[in-house]
Amino acid sequence: MRLCSFTLPGELPDMLRAGVVEGPLVFELKKRTSIMAIIQSGVAPNSLETDTGGHELDNVLLGPPVQRPLKILATIVNTQGMLGGKDVMLDRPRLDMKAPSTVVGPGAGIHVPGSGIRPEVELAMYVGRRLSAATTAQAEAGIFGYTVLNDVTAPADSREDAYEAYRRDRATGEIRKTLLRGPLFRSKNHDGFCPMGPWVVTSDENDWSDLKMTTKFGDLLVQDGSTSEYIFSPAKIASYVSKFLTLEPGDVVSCGSVGWTSEALGELDPTEFVLPMKEGTLELEIEGVGRLTNPLVVGRQ
């Protein structure tokens, strides 16, 4: 089942309705509610009743499935393409946080800072049950559904936020001044840096384990990979997080991105990659989940 949040023409953006997407139509739920309320209530999605008359998807404005998740955890690296080498392995997920207020929906403009941005297509899960010290099986059963998340990043911010500190050299044991990479928080938390959508696909709908993931910017293929590249499954990530931080219904956990294409990178190091500084439309797609499109806004706020 595909559940979406939407408004009709002329309605305010925050007056979101909840509906079920079937083909080219969206059917509003009979009971006025939100996807967040549905997730938190624990009601079975297939028990939801809809109106008989549907709206054409092209005639509604889709919002993010959940306008303000309780918290958003983003897996930083979960594929070899993001690690930069096949000889690198991880023993556990690495994560960061995105502010819930950075969430926007399909079609919302992404304002590009002067240093540029890069997109990161990610499969994101909505947590459907309270998870605390959960096993992988318990975490799997606690996933409500999946959506597409763009973990927009301004990499220059973390370079600017680098700082020096005294650290012990692992090889020599000597304590010396070391330049440390800056935190990722600022680079990932500008307003609008977390587009999500176009809807949430309930976890019973399909198998997440081998879904094609792509990002396009106009005619440029920026990312091309698959969820089969994930080192840690969504359930393993959720289980790991729940060992130290309780996950609540309505939380979002994003599972990581894939590497950038050689066509997009050119001669750039992956850590330096940003999109060309021009306006255009980003199109992120995960097979079986959906296509998320957002225009880039350059040079104006």
PLM features: what roles do these ranges have?
Residues 1, 5-21, 111, 116, ...:
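Charged, cofactor-coupling segments
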Residues 1-94, 100-101, 114, 214, ...:
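N-terminal non-catalytic cap/leader segment that marks the start of a structured domain
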Residues 32, 227-228, 298:
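Residue-level structural signal for beta-strand termini and adjacent loop
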Residues 43-64, 68, 162, 170-180, ...:
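A short, charged
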Residues 64-65, 71, 115-117, 239, ...:
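Residue "hotspots" at secondary-structure boundaries inside conserved domains
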Residues 72-229, 233-237:
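Glycine-enriched loop-and-adjacent helix/strand subsegments that border the catalytic/binding cleft
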Residues 233-277:
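A conserved acidic, glycine/proline-rich C-terminal tail/linker
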